[in-house]
Amino acid sequence: NNLYTIDAVTGAATQVGSGPFAPATNGSSFGFDFNPVIDRIRVVSDANQNLVLNPNDGTSTQVTSLFFGAGDVNFGMDPNIVGSAYTNSYAGAMSTQLYGIDTGLDILVTQANSAGTLMTVGSIGVDLNDTLSFDISGASGFAYATVVSDDFSSSTFWQINLADGSATALGEIGGGALITSMTVVPAPGALAMLGLGGLAGSRRRR
């Protein structure tokens, strides 16, 4: 496993660090986002892995595996977190909250910023699969997700309510694009979405 920076203009990839990071990722579907307060990358997986990556030298640190906290309605259930996003995702943020999407239970959760403790926010109300992406706008605080259909024929763009977890469909993404990773970025007078179709990608700092 290696960490790369991507030039937003040319698309050129540059490896961070001298080699593969360890511990390596474990799982088949992943959530990935920057913690804007400490400038570290959180990576979680459907195998309940919970890693912190250093974007400066490419090293990784294993922290507590994902689990539902005591007293939570889903305590004792096996999580399946495949989308992760932080609030207040902008330079100089003083506080942040990490959210995740569990595609096994079709719910929105919060995750402790230093540990793997999950707490249920609410039902998303959509039968999800693992081919999705999730991000929260640093400018507006609105949360969005893309979900690829089960037959891999289309992707739908959703807005996620962070207060109760409910999802509202904003429409099918045109051209039959299969969006597997996206980030919400501020643009003059509009909200822009950058996406990668057909292959896994990573988010950039906003």
Please report, for each region that a protein language model flagged, where it lies by residue.
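Short beta-strand elements that form the blades of beta-propeller/WD-repeat-like
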Residues: 1, 38-45, 97-102, 141-148
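C-terminal cell-surface anchoring/sorting signal
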Residues: 189-206
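Structural motif
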Residues: 1-5, 48-53, 105-112, 152-158
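A mid-sequence, solvent-exposed acidic-amphipathic segment
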Residues: 85-133
